[in-house]
A protein has these predicted regions:
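Transition-metal
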Residues: 1-135, 195-218, 239, 315
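Ligand-binding loop in jelly-roll beta-barrel domains
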Residues: 78, 86-91, 100, 110-111, ...
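His/acidic/aromatic-lined binding-pocket segments of jelly-roll/cupin-type domains
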Residues: 83-85, 92, 114-117, 155-156, ...
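Intrinsically disordered, low-complexity linker/loop segments enriched in Gly/Pro
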Residues: 111, 120-160, 165
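Short, basic/aromatic beta-hairpin or loop at an interaction surface
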Residues: 134-146, 258-271
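An exposed, glycine/acidic-rich loop-and-rim segment of catalytic or binding clefts
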Residues: 144-152, 163-165, 171-219
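Short acidic-glycine-tyrosine-enriched beta hairpin
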Residues: 153-165, 179, 274-294
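C-terminal amphipathic alpha-helical segment
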Residues: 191-260
Length: 315
């Protein structure tokens, strides 16, 4: 295994009808065109911004250096997690994602289980996660036809730093008032059940096939482990929150795990160095990848910083 140096990825701004034209204060990004609703942080078109791999897309890096990059999380050779920021100014559709079995039934490699970490949440912010107990598929169909589907969904209040699990098969929705860091299987399979009168295509047959009336979706309490908090540890991913301080030892954040590690800076900024490479900064709302083969990686915070560490799991 050759030694790959860590690298920062450039974000990929994606247009969505429910997004914003100005992403301040999160990004210095304005557009007079279609609004931006998603910022992909590990999308296949995200390019390395630092080090020997600078200019190469994550798709190219994974194809050319798969085992060195992913290590024991190599799986099928595709980068295993898609990580995004969501900026909803309006309601997203009420939607559901398939599990692996259903996705593969229709020729796709994997389904879509995800989790949401609230980087910010305004007063009264909430999301819809799952169907209320006792509701039947016939009632759901009637709710779609009468534009009252929201009344049948479980509404979950959301505060800053909350973690929510959204397993495949969970009917869910999101609206304004939140900024979400989403970690998901690398899949963009979404079946819309209801879209608030907008003209986008609905996928009712597949939605009802994918939907489960009872799931494990919901808010996950953090678990303190030594110098960090485990926000969620599930089949496809583990997400941790590290509060870095120059006066405290946080060397565990960069210890090798045998697989790829992903660091997202939620607050403050950090600097990453490793053997045989030039150190580079990672600022707020930026993401860095630590390949499985990187040697002697050191993460330094000159002042207080909050870093979200994400590690894929190979199911």
């Amino acid at each position: 295994m050759s030694n790959l140096f860590p690298f920062r990825l450039e974000p990929w701004f994606r247009t969505r009808i429910w997004g914003f034209h100005d992403l301040a204060p999160w990004y210095d990004y304005k557009t007079e065109g279609e609004p931006i609703g998603e910022v992909w942080l590990t999308g296949e078109m995200c390019a390395a911004a630092t080090g020997p791999l600078a200019g190469k897309s994550l798709q190219e890096i994974t194809a050319q250096h798969g085992h060195d990059l992913l290590g024991n999380t190599y799986g099928d050779g595709q980068f295993p997690l898609l990580i995004k920021l969501l900026f909803p100014k309006d309601k997203l559709s009420v939607q559901v994602h398939p599990d692996d079995a259903m996705a593969q039934k229709y020729g796709e490699p994997r389904g879509k289980t995800e989790c949401w970490y609230a980087l910010d949440a305004g007063p009264g912010a909430h999301v819809a996660l799952g169907i209320k107990p006792g509701v039947t598929p016939d009632q759901i169909r009637a709710g779609i036809e009468s534009s009252s589907l929201e009344d049948l969904l479980e509404m979950i209040p959301v505060a800053k730093n909350d973690m929510l699990f959204v397993d495949a098969g969970t009917v869910h929705a999101m609206g304004p008032g939140v900024v979400i860091l989403e970690t998901q299987q690398t899949s963009d399979l979404t079946y819309r059940m209801y879209d608030y009168g907008r003209p986008r295509e609905l996928h009712l047959d597949k939605s009802f096939e994918a939907m489960r009336l009872k799931t494990r979706a919901g808010k996950i309490p953090p678990r303190t482990v030594n110098s960090h908090s485990v926000l969620i540890d599930e089949k496809y991913f583990e997400v941790e929150r590290w509060l870095l301080d120059p006066a405290k030892d946080a060397s565990g954040i960069s210890k090798p795990t045998g697989g790829v590690q992903i660091l997202f800076v939620a607050e403050g900024k950090i600097r990453i160095s490793a053997d045989e490479g030039e150190a580079f900064p990672v600022n707020r709302c930026e993401l860095a990848v630590i390949p499985a083969s990187s040697h002697n990686v050191f993460v330094d915070a000159g002042s207080a910083a909050t870093v979200i560490r994400i590690q894929p799991r190979v199911a």
